[in-house]
C-alpha cells in the first residue's frame, strides 16, 4: 500500500484541533440555529408568525442577543447561509456578535437530502459540488466549522448496506474538503427516531452506521482530531411501547460510541432528535454520569431542544424579545450543566420544556 500524501500541514492540523477543542470545552456545547427557510416556516407557523426574511432575522436576534452568561455554556453556533450575512438592529453583523462572545461560528453546508435510487425510500445528501469554493468563502466570512447532515432510518429493511456506505462516503468527502479549507467538519449521521424499534435495535444500527462512518473517514485521510461527531443518542423508536430510563439510554449510547468512535475524536455533540427540552437535558446528563470510561467530550448540538421555550415566549412580538432570550439562556445553562453530569432537574413538570418536539421524517 502506498503512503498517503500528507494533505494537511502541522499548522493546519493544529488550527483544526484548536477550533474543535474550543467548541467542546468543558461545559460547552453548540446552538444549532441553521434551520433552512423551509424549516423556519414550520417553526414560525406554530406561533402564527409569517415566514419572512425580517421575521427570521428578528427571531435569530432573540437568540444571538443573549448576554455573557452564554459564554460558559455555548462553544459554537451553527448558522444558515442567510443568517451568516444578517445584522442586528444596530447594524452589527450577527457573526461579529457571536465572535465577540468568544463563541465559534459555524455554517451548515449541505444542500439537503435526496432519494437514493434502488432503495426503499432511503436518501443521500447533496451539496458536494462547489463545496470547496463555498468553504473557502465561508472561512473568509468568519466561519471556522461546518455541519453536514445525512439521514438514515430504521425499519425491517433499512438502513440498507448501500445507504450506510453511500452516506458514510459522502460524509467523508465533505469532511476532507472542509479540512482543506481550514474548517472543522461536524459529521452528522442521524438515525431518525421514527418507528417502533426498541433500544437494542437502535444501538445495533447506530454501531453499524458509526463503524462505517469512521472507516470512510480513515479511507479519505480525514484528520480525526480536527473533527466532531453529531450523532443521535441511542433511543427507542418514537412508537416503541417500552419506556426506557435516561440511565438505560445513556448506557446504550456510551456503549455504542465506545465500540466505534476513536478516542482521537475530541467531542461528540448529540442532536436532540425531537426529544423535549427536558428529556434532551436529562438524557445528556445521564450520559455524562455513565459509569463507563468516556475519552471524548459528550455534549450537545441542539436546535429545537434549546429554542422551543424561547420561540414560544417570543411569538413574533418585539416586547417579548427579552423574555424569550431569557428562556434560551435558561436552556443553554441547563445543558451546560448536563454536559458535565451536574444537572439535577428544574422541578418543572409541565410547560413548553416538557413538550415533545418530534416531527415524523424530519427534514432540515
From Swiss-Prot:
Name of protein: Fructose-bisphosphate aldolase C
Subunit text: Homotetramer. Interacts with ATP6V1E1. May interact with PLD2.
Modification Phosphotyrosine, positions: 5
Protein EC: 4.1.2.13
Species of origin: Homo sapiens (Human)
InterPro entries: Aldolase_I_AS, Aldolase_TIM, FBA_I
UniProt keyword terms in alphabetical order: Acetylation, Glycolysis, Lyase, Phosphoprotein, Schiff base
Gene behind this protein: ALDOC
Binding site for substrate: 56, 147
GO molecular function terms listed in the Swiss-Prot or TrEMBL record: cytoskeletal protein binding; fructose-bisphosphate aldolase activity
Note: In vertebrates, three forms of this ubiquitous glycolytic enzyme are found, aldolase A in muscle, aldolase B in liver and aldolase C in brain.
Name of the top EC class for this enzyme: lyase
PROSITE patterns (alphabetical): ALDOLASE_CLASS_I (PS00158)
GO biological process, one term: fructose 1,6-bisphosphate metabolic process
Catalytic activity of the protein: beta-D-fructose 1,6-bisphosphate = D-glyceraldehyde 3-phosphate + dihydroxyacetone phosphate
Protein family membership: Belongs to the class I fructose-bisphosphate aldolase family.
